[in-house]
C-alpha cells in the first residue's frame, strides 16, 4: 500500500501524528469513528483487512505517543492463549451491542484473531452513569491502554468510571485491533441457513435494519448478545431473583470541577448501608426516605439512590400507588418535576450541601438526566450459551453483560462480571474454533458460568497481571468439568420439538422449584417415625400422630429433653398442666434452638386437637436441627466436655444471635438481638415465635433491659453517629441498623396484602386459636405465613415499626412491653416521644399501614389497567410476588423480558417523551458540551480537569463557571451550549494565563494515581490552588519574574486559601445563600479579569473570590474578588516596590480582610456560626465595610511599621489596596483563610498578619472578630463534617483569644487585652491575611518595622497556624519559649478546625522543627519570644505564661496566641522575619489543612480527637522550656516521630489483634502529628504495648532523636534526642543566617520527617506534612533570609516556597503534577530554602545534613516509608517535567527544594495514602459484603414470600377453604389436586405441604446465617470505628482532657472490648457450625440451588 501521503515525511508524519492524537482524544462515539476513518485514509489502511490491520498501522504510525499504546497492546496480545492472533483465525463473530461488555468481548476475540463485526443501534454514547470498578477491572483496562485514552482513568484512589468514558476507551482499542464496528444498525433476528445447501452453502446470517446494510449478507459462526436485553436472542431461560420492591433513581449533575466540588466526599458503593442515622436525618429534614445512596464524582456528579415507595408517594413523585411496578413507575404515574426536586434534594443533603450548584446534566433527549426504574427483580440467564444447528450449519449463541446476568449495580458487579463473562465467552469461542464438540464446549462454558454469580472482588484470583482468556487464571478453584456434556444436551438445538419447550420456558419459569435434596420428610410418616423414636420411653408420652399425641406438651418436652436433658426437668412435669408444659417447651425451643412457636401454650390447651399443618411445620424444625445429632444416651451424667459438645451441637445460631444481640444491643443502641435473632429465625419460619407465656415475659424483660440501655447507648451513639456521619464513617450499629432496617424495610408489603386479601377470616376452624389472627391487622394468618415475636403472631408485612412504618425483621426489632408496640432499633428511643415527635415519621407509618389496604384497593385497578396486555404472561413470569397484590399477572412481565430495568426506564422515557413533544435526540457533542462543559472549559488540556497550575485561576474559572453553566440547569440545551461557549471563552483566558494549568493537570493525574481517595477529592481543588503556589514556590520563578514575586507568590500561597476557599465554598454551599451565588457570579467576572491580568496570582484571586462568594453576600464577595485580583497583581508589583508604603498597603490590605472579618465576626460571627463556619467567616459583610476603613488606617500603621517587610506585604497587597475593593479583598482573603478546613492554622497565619496590621493600625478588633468568625466557621465546618471537636474548638478559640491578645498586643503592642482579644479574633480572620502578609514578608523578608515584631508576629501567627496544624511544630517555630506557646496555640487551633488536626499535627511537628531553628535564632536574638503575645514585645517576656498558655491554650484556640509568641520581637532580625515567614508557611500549611481536614476527615472520623491531640501535645511540651526549647523542640520534632510510635502503642493497647495493625499504623501517623508531649508519651506507651513492630518503629524514632521509646517524656526521654534537637536548635542559633536555616532544617526536618510519616499514615496528615515540610524549609529559608535581610526578594520566594510548599505539598500529594508542585512546595520551602541555599551553600549542606539526620529519625519514627517516600519524592520532584516557564521555575525550585523535608512530606504522604487507601479498601470490602448480605436477605425474603403464598394456597386447599381460588397465582397447584378439595389428608397436597415446610426451614436457616454474617459485619465495622475514635482521642495528652473526656475514652474502650468479645464468640459460633454442618450445608446448598435460591446472584 506504500507510504503514499506519508512520503512527505515532515508534513505527512506530523499530519498522521495529529490525526492519531485527534483519534485518541476524541470524546464522542461519532468523533472517534470519524477520526479513525481519517487516520486510516491518510495512512491508506483498510480496517477490514483485520488480520494485518493492526500490524500495518503499527508500522506506519511511528509516533512516540502511539508506541506507548502499541507496547500495551502488544503485551496483551503476547498471551500464549492467543497464539499470536491465530487461535480463532477462521471464526466469524457477530456481537450485538457496543456497551462495555460487548466491546470487551470484541477485543478479546480480536486478540484471538477472529473476524469480529459489532453492531450498535445508536451512534452516541450518552450514559453518564458511573460504574464502580473492581481492582482486576482497573488492571485489565490499564493493560489495554486506558490511561492513554483517558488520562484521569482511576487516578489515585478513584475506582469508578462513567459508562460513556469506558465505552469510548474500549471503542478505540477495538478499532485499533481491526474490529468492524457499525453504528445505527439494529439487529432484528437470525436467518437460518436455507434448506437447499447443494447449490450454495449459505450459513447463519443476521437480519439487520436498515435492510440494505452489508451486514445482512455476512455469515457467522458465533453470535453474542451484549445489548442488555433479555430476549434479543431466544432460547435462554431466565432465573429471577426478586428482592422486595426496589426503586432506583439515578441522577447526573453537571460537574464543573471546581475546588469546592472536588472537596466533596464521594459516597462509595454502600457506604451508607451502615449509617442509619444519616437516613433518619435525611427523612426528618426532607421527607425523603432512602435505603441507600451512592455518589461518585466523574464527568458528572453521579448519584444513585434506592428510594422507598412511601416517601415517593408522600413527596408526590409517584402519583398513585399501584401494585404493579410497571404501572407504578410508568411515565404517566410519575411527576417529573417532583422527581427532579427529589433527586436534587437527596443529592444536596447527602453531600452536606457542599456542591455549589446542582444543575442536571442532560440525557440524549435533551432532558434532565434523571431516571427512575425498578430493580426489584434481577434476572439471570440459566445458561450462558447454546448451539443451534440447522441444515448442516452450527451457530454458537452466547450472552454477555446484563443480558447474561443482571448486576447489583451499587457494587460494580455488572462491569466486573461482565468482563469476566466476556473473557469466558472468548475462551468458549477459542475452544469452538479448536474443533471441540458442541456439547463439550457448552459443558465447559456452563461449568465456568456457575462460578460467575458468586464472584466478588475477594474471591477472584489476586494475581491480576496474570489474567488472560483462560478461566483458570481468573477463578481460583475452578473445575472446567463440573458440568458434564450430557447435562447440557438441552442446549444443543437441532430444530426438533425441543425449541418449543425452550421458547416457552423462556417466557414461563417453572414456579415450583424442584427439590433435589433427599426428600427427608416429604412423607409425614418419616417425620412421625423420627418423633416416635426420639420420645420412646418417656412416661406419659405416646406419639401416634402429628396432632393429638402432642397436646399435653409432654411429647414436646420429651423431644427437647432427649437432646438437652439440662434444659428441662422432665420428671417434674405434670401431665395435666397442658398449658404450662407446652409453654415451657415453646419457650425453651425458642430460646435455645431458635425455633419460633406456632402458637401459645394457652391455645394448645384450648384446642381439641392441635392443627396438623402447624405441628408438621413446628416439628419439622426439630427434625432438621437434630436429625444428625446423636442424643446423649441414657447416662445423664455427662462430663463437662461432653456437655459442652452437646450444647454446641444443638445450639442454634439464631438463639445465639439473640443472646449476643442482647448484650450488643445494650452496648449499642441496637436492639436486643435476642428477640431479633429469634425473630430472625422466626422470620424464616414465620410461625416460630416466642410463646406468649414466660418466654414472652422473659423476652420482654430482656427486651426492656436491652432496650433501655440501648436507648442510653443510642443517645451516646447518636453523638458518635453524627460525627461519624459527618465523616462518612458510619457506625457498625448504624450499619447493622441500616442493614437490618433495609432488610426489614418495605418487606413484601404487597404480597402480604395480597395474601390477606383473600384470607379475611370468614370463620376460623374450631382448632384455630389466637395464633391464627394477626396481632396487627386482626386478619387470618395462615401457618406458612405466620411470624411470631414477643408472643404475638402476625403477617410479615404487618410487622412494622410503630414510629416510621418500616417493615421489621424478626432479627432486628425493639419491643416496648408497656405499650406493646414494635419499633425499628433506630426509633426505639422515640417510642415515648409519642405523636409529638412523629412529625414526618408518623405519616410514613400510617402510610405503611394504609399501604396494605391501599395496595389491595389499588390492586383491582392495577389488574384492570395494566393487566390486559400483560396477562398473557405466564404465571411463572408474573411471580406471585409480582402479582401479589392484585392477584393479576404483572403487566410488566412482558416488558421485563426485553430489557434491564434501566433500559426499560429509558424506553418508557422515550415513548412518553415522544408523545408529549417531538423529542429530537441531542447530538453527543452537544451533550458533552452541556454536561462536561466545566471539564472541557477548564481542563481540556488537563485531562484530569484539575489544573493544579492555576488553582486560583481555576477556582475563579470554576466559580465563573458555576455562575454560568451552573445556570444551565433550567436552560434549554441549545441555549446552554451557547452559554457554555461564552463561559468557556471567559475562563479559558485565565487558564491560559496560568500556563501551568496544563502541565499541572497532567502531573496531577499521575500523582492522583498515587493519592488516596481522600486526597483525590480535595486534590483537585488543592491542585488548583497548589499549582500556582508551586509556581510561586520555585525560587526561580519567584525571583525571576515579577509575576511570581514573593509577595505574589505569597498571595497565591493564599491558595492554601484555596483549600480554605474550598472549605468555605463548602460552608457557603451549606449556607447556600443566593447572594453568595450572585456575588460569586459577579465577582467571578471580576476575578476572571484579574486572573487574566495576573496569571501568577490567578489562584489567589480565585481563592479569594471563591471564598468571598462563599463566605459572604454578594458585595463582600465581589469586593473580595476584586481585591484578590488586585492583590495578585500587586504581588508582583509588591516585589518591585518593597517600600514601606507598599508594605503598609499590603498590610493594610491584609488587615482589612482581617478587620472586615473581624467586624463581620462581631455581627456576623453568630450568624456565621449558625450558617456554617466557613460561610460565617467570609460572610461578615459588616466586617467588610468596616475593614475598609480599618484597612486604610492599618496601611498607615503598616507602612511605617514594616518597611522591608511591609514592602513584601505590600508587594501583593499594594495593588490590592489601590482599588477600593482591596480592603474587601483582604476580607475575602481572610475569609478564605477561615474557609480553610485547617482554619486554625490559617487563622494563626492571619493572626500574624493581623498582629502586624494591628500594630500598624487598629484593626485588632477586626482581627478578633475575624478570629472569632474563623473559629465559629471552623466549628461550623467541623460540625457539618461531623467533627465533634467543634465546640471544644470554640472554647479553645475563646481561650485562645484571651491569650491571643498577647500576640495581638504584640502587633498593636499598645492594645489592651480587650483589644488583643479582639485582635485575636481578627487573627483568625487575619489568618488568611497573615498568610498574605507572611508570604509577602517572607518574599521580602522585610517588614522589619513592624517587622521584627511584625515579622515575629507573623512567624508566630503562622506558627500558630502551623500549630493549629501541628501544635508541636508551631511551637518549635517560635522562639524557644515562644515555640512552646505556639504549640499551645497550635493545639488550640486544631480544636478550632478538627478535621485538619491530624494533618496539622504532622505539619506541626514539621513546623516545630522549623520553629526550633527559628527559635534558636529568636532565642539568640531575644528570649522574649517566649512571651505569648508575639505582637507585643513586652509580652515577649510573657513567654513563661506561654507555657502556661500552652496547656490552657491547648484547650482553647490559642493558636493565635501562639502566633503572637512566634511574633516575638526577638526575631525582629530578618531571620526572625524569616521565621515569621516560615510560620506563615506553616500557616499556609494549615491552610492546606483545610483540604487536609477533609483528608483527615476521611482518615479519622473524629476531628475533635485530632484537635485535642494537637492541643495537648504541642502546647505543654515545647512551650514549657525556653532553654530546653531547643531541646524540647528537637524532642518535639523527634517526638512527633515518637508520638507516632507511642500513639501506635496506645492504639494497639485498646485494639483487638485484628485492629492492631491498622491501629498501629494510625497511631504511628498520629504520633507523628501529635504535638503534646503527654500525648506523645501516652502514644509511645501505647505503641510499645501495641506491638513489637511498634517497638522497632519507636527505636527508629529514637535513633532519629536519640530518644528513648517513651515519647511522652520526649524532653527528658532521651538526652540524645534532646541533644540532637538542641543541637539542631543551637545550630540554628549559631548561624542565624545559614546555621539558623541549617538548624532549622535539621530539627525542622527531623520533625518534618516524623510529621511526614505520621501524616502519610493518616490521609489528611500526609497532605499537611507536605506543607509542613515546605514550611520548615521555608523557616530555614526565612532564617537565612533574615540573616541576609538584604535579599528580600529571595526571602519572598522562600516565603512563597513555604506557602507553596505547604500548598503544593498538599496538592502534590494529590497529583503528580502536584507532586511536582510538591517539589515546588519543597522548592517553595526550598525555594525560600533554595534562595537561601543559593545565598548560602552552608545552609544547604546543613539542611542536607540535617535532612539526613532527620530522614533517619523520621524514618525511625515514620518508618522506612518516609525515607522511601522522601527519595521517591526527591526523584519525582527532580524529574517532574513541567512544560511551562512556571513549571520550569517550579522544577528548578523543586530540585533545590527537594530536601529531605519535601521528600519526607512526600513519603509521608505516600505512606499515609497507602494507609488511607488500605483503610478505605477495608471499609469498602465491608460495605460490599454488607450489600451482598442485604441483597441476599432481600432475596430470601422474596423466596419466603413466594413459599408462603404457595403454602397458603396449599393450606386453603387442605382445609377446603374455597375462597382460595380467585386469589392465588398458584391455581396450577390446586388444579392438580382438585380431587383433594376438602380432604384434610389428601396425600398429594400433604406431600406438597411437607415440601414447602422443608424449603421454608432451609430458608430460615439460611436467613439466620445471613443475619449472623450481617451481625459480624456490623460488629467489625463498629469496632473499627471505635478504634479510630479511640486513637484520635488518645492522641491528646490525658492531662489536657476533662474528667468527662477521660470517662468517655474509657467507655469507648470498654465498648470496644465488648464488641471484640462478641465478635470472638460470633466467629467461634460460626466456626463450630461450619464444622458441624459441613455436610448438611452441602445438602442445603444443593437444595437452595435446585430451587433457584442461589443467593449469590446479586
From Swiss-Prot:
It comes from the Eukaryota. Keywords: Actin-binding, Coiled coil, Cytoplasm, Cytoskeleton, Exocytosis, FAD, Flavoprotein, LIM domain, Metal-binding, Monooxygenase, NADP, Nucleus, Oxidoreductase, Zinc. Residues 666-708, 843-900, 917-1064, 1176-1263, 1281-1476, 1493-1555, 1598-1747 are annotated as: Disordered. It comes from Danio rerio (Zebrafish). It catalyses: L-methionyl-[F-actin] + NADPH + O2 + H(+) = L-methionyl-(R)-S-oxide-[F-actin] + NADP(+) + H2O. PANTHER family: [F-ACTIN]-MONOOXYGENASE MICAL3, CALPONIN HOMOLOGY DOMAIN-CONTAINING PROTEIN DDB_G0272472-RELATED. One of its GO terms (cellular component) is cytoskeleton. Residues 1661-1679 have a biased composition (Basic residues). It is found in: Cytoplasm; Cytoplasm, Cytoskeleton; Nucleus. It is an enzyme of class 1 (oxidoreductase). Residues 521-627 form the Calponin-homology (CH) domain. SUPFAM superfamilies: Calponin-homology domain, CH-domain, FAD/NAD(P)-binding domain, Glucocorticoid receptor-like (DNA-binding domain). Transmembrane segments: none annotated. Its main location: cytoplasm. Residues 917-926, 951-961, 1001-1037, 1046-1060 have a biased composition (Acidic residues). FAD binds at residues 101-129, 402. The keyword NADP applies. The gene is mical3a. This is Protein-methionine sulfoxide oxidase mical3a. Residues 772-834 form the LIM zinc-binding domain. GO terms for biological process: actin filament depolymerization; cytoskeleton organization; exocytosis. Its EC number is 1.14.13.225. Residues 1437-1458 have a biased composition (Pro residues). Signal peptide: none annotated. Residues 674-684, 975-987, 1249-1263, 1287-1297, 1464-1476, 1616-1635, 1680-1693, 1730-1746 have a biased composition (Basic and acidic residues). Residues 1816-1982 form the bMERB domain. InterPro entries: bMERB_dom, CH_dom, CH_dom_sf, F-actin_Monoox_Mical, FAD-bd, FAD/NAD-bd_sf, Znf_LIM.
